[in-house]
Amino acid sequence: MNELIKHKLELLPDSPGCYLHKDKNGTIIYVGKAKNLKNRVKSYFHGSHNTKTELLVSEIEDFEYIVTTSNTEALLLEINLIQENMPKYNIRLKDDKSYPYIKITNERYPRLMITRQVKKSDGTYFGPYPDSGAATEIKRLLDRLFPFKKCTNPANKVCFYYHLGQCNAHTVCQTNKAYWDSLREDVKQFLNGKDNKIVNGLTEKMKSAAMTMEFERAAEYRDLIEAISLLRTKQRVIHQDMKDRDVFGYFVDKGWMCVQVFFVRNGKLIQRDVNMFPYYNEPEEDFLTYIGQFYQDTKHFLPKEVFIPQDIDAKSVETIVGCKIVKPQRGEKKQLVNLAIKNARVSLQQKFDLLEKDIRKTHGAIENLGNLLNIPKPVRIEAFDNSNIQGTSPVAAMVVFVNGKPSKKDYRKFKIKTVIGPDDYASMREVIHRRYSRVLKDGLTPPDLIVIDGGQGQVNIARDVIENQFGLAIPIAGLQKNDKHQTHELLFGDPLEVVELPRNSEEFFLLHRIQDEVHRFAITFHRQLRSKNSFSSKLDGITGLGPKRKQLLMKHFKSLPNIQKAEIEDIIMCGIPRTVAESLRDSLNDPPK
């Protein structure tokens, strides 16, 4: 078991879901389901196993998981994932015929039946269901609700079920094709969750039976209503409409966004895509950018429709994507979007938790890093990063690691003061100059190593300030990221060269942690500053609203939209005079000219 798996095992949730074991090439070699992901996945790596399982475990280099909201959901998702990926250690399932369906036959008097043979020309099929027990339970309920043929009697001879109101396959009922087609549609609507009409009808019958003292019959109706209520806990991973759709959910935290996409094909959730990246604007804006880039990639098939969360503007997405965009409001479809959001949150939290656990791997990392760079052991490391969007509110940040752990009391933020426009090199020069002039002036402890989040240009700028302006001899390294914002290369030396850094080494984990932390700290500060500047600029020019009162409003309401929604009395409660509060409301609510 490698270190990555050890850490990920500690972070597994106590939730139902599916897990996907992968080999060294990232290929899915086994898909499983679990009532409790933590217990089930851990069991592979502890205790004794049979020969087949030991062979599987020997090939596992990584795993991922998808959280579901029920055990049955996990089972149905497992079916879909196995059929889509055909992992070599799973039982090979050629098609859906291994699973039971409920069928309405195309006979003159249609019947409800359970079958594993799908021939679409001879009936209407619903499913597949995870096992025969689930299919039988649902069919039993359908038999009580819908009067399909339930007997072998000739049409002119009524049966026992006819007297119960559960079989209309008799000439005395005078049914025609339109009647049975309507009944077939009622079943379809019912299984798709549109059961209010039936429940309301049963409720009225129950009340009527109770009023006439027919308590046994009232109890039967009550039991039917309860059975329907149980069925309402439907599976969100299979949809009867058989449509192709992509379902998006996202979650943001600590300057990072995680987007999860569920790929639903022929009504089945068969795959998911996960992407995590730092975001710089409002989350909704960066999500729109992401979804546009997602479908520009030719490998992504454009489905019939795309589901998005409530806070995203559907018209904007439709303009970008070019297909039907849906923001589900309720029911099964809304729950599927919520499931994508939940998995995005879980994935992002796992990323942060793994980074926290990486701190434990710093034993020996500092010494190894010193040996790698041929410098004394870097006990104190100071790292820098710039953050700006098109030159607006440019800032920089410094984080400090002592003995491989963050020393947050030593973190520093910098507003860029001398640079106009987006100029990373000039910004880096200003920040390094300000930091180390203060170190010299105040007699502060200099670092053993400076790490710059950037490439050759930024490192050379920092070196020029440190060596030529201050005459200091502090080693400086650069960390470059790839196009996925992941730690990619370590630059060091004079001239700068790429230092080979094994990705499974302790020193790589330390540098990865430092780079992520300084980036998080910088963009969080940048976002706060932009928000504050935007807030203040829109309050400028309002008579009687000076810096102190703006600060009071910012502290209490957090954002302009909150002020716009606030009542005058709420604003006055913050210590703002009534005349100023009224002027403020009028100014914010006036349409732009």
Curated annotation (Swiss-Prot):
The keyword DNA damage applies. SUPFAM superfamilies: C-terminal UvrC-binding domain of UvrB, GIY-YIG endonuclease, RuvA domain 2-like. CDD domains: GIY-YIG_UvrC_Cho. Keywords: Cytoplasm, DNA damage, DNA excision, DNA repair, Excision nuclease, SOS response. One of its GO terms (biological process) is SOS response. Residues 196-231 form the UVR domain. Residues 14-91 form the GIY-YIG domain. GO terms for molecular function: DNA binding; excinuclease ABC activity. One of its GO terms (cellular component) is excinuclease repair complex. It is found in: Cytoplasm. Interacts with UvrB in an incision complex. NCBIfam families: uvrC. Belongs to the UvrC family. HAMAP family: UvrC. The UvrABC repair system catalyzes the recognition and processing of DNA lesions. UvrC both incises the 5' and 3' sides of the lesion. The N-terminal half is responsible for the 3' incision and the C-terminal half is responsible for the 5' incision. This is UvrABC system protein C. It comes from Streptococcus agalactiae serotype V (strain ATCC BAA-611 / 2603 V/R). The gene is uvrC.
